[in-house]
Amino acid sequence: MDFISIIQSAPPIILKKLEDLKGLRERPDYHPEPSTFHHIEIVTNRLIPTENMDLILAGVLHDICKLDCVRVNPKNGHPTSPGHDVAAFNLITETPEIQNWIKGMGADLIKVAHICLGHMRFHQLGQMREFKREKQIQDWKDQGIWDALAIHGAADNMIEEFDLNNLEKSWKWKRS
């Protein structure tokens, strides 16, 4: 299994969005890769060795709506895509073709959607007060997605080297 074979089975709406993301260059200090498409490919390839289809498809879909939400940050001139996590969640939960693809690939639709929804909040855990952070982590544990988010969050960080055996090293935040 590789990224290309996974996306070749995706519905046309996903293929179109992926193609369009080849033209979106993100903030280079967080995303040194050439485009959002390449970022998605890297994240997905990092997740394939887990053999967890929930994670693998979340890798494909987590940034799928970045172009839909993009705007220029007036402070630094870099593109930003606020709300792309919510937009991806909505796209997944409201599009039968995507739902059928996820299920057909052997993944859990609800888990994939919630990993996509939580992926930005995961990166912000280090900015939260300890009580709020631990409550959020417990909520994700209750949803059955904490372990997957911990892996996805490490795979999604382009600044640190990804190490499946040492996830916290790759997180954008450090546990106190």
Language-model features and meaning:
Residues 161-162, 166-175:
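Long, amphipathic alpha-helical surface segments
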Residues 46-165:
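Divalent metal-dependent catalytic cores for phosphoryl transfer on phosphate-bearing substrates
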Residues 1-73, 77-79:
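Acidic/His-rich, divalent-metal-binding segments that scaffold phosphate/diphosphate chemistry
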Residues 2-6, 10-17, 36-39, 84, ...:
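Alpha-helical structural motif
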Residues 1, 175-176:
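Short intrinsically disordered terminal tails
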